[in-house]
């Protein structure tokens, strides 16, 4: 089995004016495709790992051959992270129900959560991701470098937990529209969070 680039469940311009069409198309067809291609190349002679779903593979990086660990950390990580990212974007959904209640419980308020998430995204130096994760029965905000995922665990990524939603803060995710204004990009994210997808991920793990 080889990994394939997932189709987006919306058109490239569906998130306008918040996320622009050109960035979405390049991000999906060029950047994400490259992670898929590189992960597949690294797995060519590793059948015991090539058949794993990518979300499972990145939890087992300590088991892959040493000469493949970094390339799979970066590229299988990139494939997993972007696959989650695309599903987590949609205009017009509302934070409600059990996930909203859990956010209010664990952060004090939705506004407090957003402020903590924005800080994690804005202060991640260089390239990386900000995440809302479920750790046990508690929600937390974490960030990771490069294409690391909380699913990789603390020893590899410095973070842990099951991702509920994630935000890509690599410059390729926003530079065409926002240039160096990462905080503006982060603010626009709230207009396109797919809270239905986040709620489904939360419900599946709580």
UniProtKB/Swiss-Prot annotation:
Binds 1 Mn(2+) ion per subunit. Gene3D superfamilies: Fe,Mn superoxide dismutase (SOD) domain (1.10.287.990), Iron/manganese superoxide dismutase, C-terminal domain (3.55.40.20). Keywords: Manganese, Metal-binding, Oxidoreductase. Pfam families: Sod_Fe_C, Sod_Fe_N. The keyword Oxidoreductase applies. The keyword Oxidoreductase applies. Its cofactor is Mn(2+). Destroys superoxide anion radicals which are normally produced within the cells and which are toxic to biological systems. Belongs to the iron/manganese superoxide dismutase family. This is Superoxide dismutase [Mn]. It comes from Salmonella typhi. The gene is sodA.
